[in-house]
Amino acid sequence: MGTPELKIILEFSAGAELLFGNIKRRELNLDGKQKWTIANLLKWMHANILTERPELFLQGDTVRPGILVLINDTDWELLGELDYELQPNDNVLFISTLHGG
């Protein structure tokens, strides 16, 4: 029997995808033996898929102001933000509200 996996979908919109190799959607198979919170996911994203200007996406251990995070179409602030524990087939959407003028 194989290692358990946690399958989730990451989506990036409104310019956030530019920081992640211009890829708008990624299906991930994370190690299912560990507990995955949004905090852990952000660290994984920084180490593995954040390709451009991390200061535009992260501020300390969280997303910077101006990045909206929706989990299954619900504002992450209603779900515990960094402490939210990811569930199988969760859809995590990052939307940038930071636009140049």
Swiss-Prot record:
Its main location: cytoplasm. InterPro entries: Beta-grasp_dom_sf, Mopterin_synth/thiamin_S_b, Urm1. GO terms for biological process: negative regulation of JNK cascade; protein urmylation; tRNA thio-modification; tRNA wobble uridine modification. One of its GO terms (cellular component) is cytoplasm. Signal peptide: none annotated. It is found in: Cytoplasm. HAMAP family: Urm1. Belongs to the URM1 family. This is Ubiquitin-related modifier 1 homolog. The lineage of its organism: Eukaryota, Metazoa, Ecdysozoa, Arthropoda, Hexapoda.
